[in-house]
Amino acid sequence: MCLMVTLVEHPLVQHKLSLMRDERTGVKEFRELAGELSLLLAYEAMRDLEVEPVRFATPIEEGDFPMLSGKKLALVAILRAGLVMTDAIVTLVPAAKVGHIGMYRDPQSLAPVAYYSKLPADIAERRVFLTDPMLATGGSANAAIQNLKDAGAQSIKLMTILAAPEGIHAVQQAHPDVDIVTASVDSRLNDHGYIVPGLGDAGDRIYGTK
């Protein structure tokens, strides 16, 4: 199976992303924009959810109407920045279970290491939407995806606000069965591993830290 990258180019998505890129955008507005953009990305990421007809009565007449069916959902945030995405998306799918994966970079090998993982016990039975605003080198995403697979997850989709070509390639090589939904594929990574033109450090801008 080949990885598919869905680029969401809706005018509202691109407008909100441009506001996030602007260095003049403050913490409150940046956080709100990240949540709003996550909802718009979720609309596209969940386009293929299964529905089935359910019979009930409206105030006018009885009929068969489409309702979600198939696998239940799980939203999993890569800490810390992914939280702003899952917090927004869960308002769309309140029955979804929410998990968290914390990552740090080993100072010697520079490899990402999971320091925290709390996932739904029935993760194998759920469609998983993994959230992280930035897909830069792909190291954290790949480690988180492997963590999910080790826990039994079989259906995983990565949702990210920005992606670099290097990160997409890394995920494609390691996990060709995981699709990506993003608002933009930027030009490259700089020497410090930041996405260019990017929007800076998403976590710092969401939480007002440095």
UniProtKB/Swiss-Prot annotation:
Activity regulation information from UniProt: Allosterically activated by GTP.
Gene Ontology terms for molecular function: GTP binding; magnesium ion binding; uracil phosphoribosyltransferase activity
InterPro entries: PRibTrfase_dom, PRTase-like, Upp_B, UPRTase/APRTase, Ura_phspho_trans
UniProt entry keywords in alphabetical sequence: Allosteric enzyme, Glycosyltransferase, GTP-binding, Magnesium, Nucleotide-binding, Transferase
Catalytic activity entry: UMP + diphosphate = 5-phospho-alpha-D-ribose 1-diphosphate + uracil
Protein residues bound to uracil: 195, 200-202
Cellular component, GO, one term: cytoplasm
GO biological process, one term: uracil salvage
SUPFAM superfamilies referenced in this protein's UniProt entry, alphabetically: PRTase-like (SSF53271)
Keyword Glycoprotein: no
Enzyme Commission code: 2.4.2.9
Textual note on the cofactor: Binds 1 Mg(2+) ion per subunit. The magnesium is bound as Mg-PRPP.
Named cofactor requirement(s): Mg(2+)
Binding of 5-phospho-alpha-D-ribose 1-diphosphate, residues: 80, 105, 132-140, 201
A Pfam family recorded for this sequence: UPRTase
Keyword check for Glycosyltransferase: yes
Pathway this chain belongs to: Pyrimidine metabolism; UMP biosynthesis via salvage pathway; UMP from uracil: step 1/1
HAMAP family associated with the record: Upp_B
Function of the protein: Catalyzes the conversion of uracil and 5-phospho-alpha-D-ribose 1-diphosphate (PRPP) to UMP and diphosphate.
Family: Belongs to the UPRTase family.
Record protein name field: Uracil phosphoribosyltransferase
Organism per entry: Deinococcus radiodurans (strain ATCC 13939 / DSM 20539 / JCM 16871 / CCUG 27074 / LMG 4051 / NBRC 15346 / NCIMB 9279 / VKM B-1422 / R1)
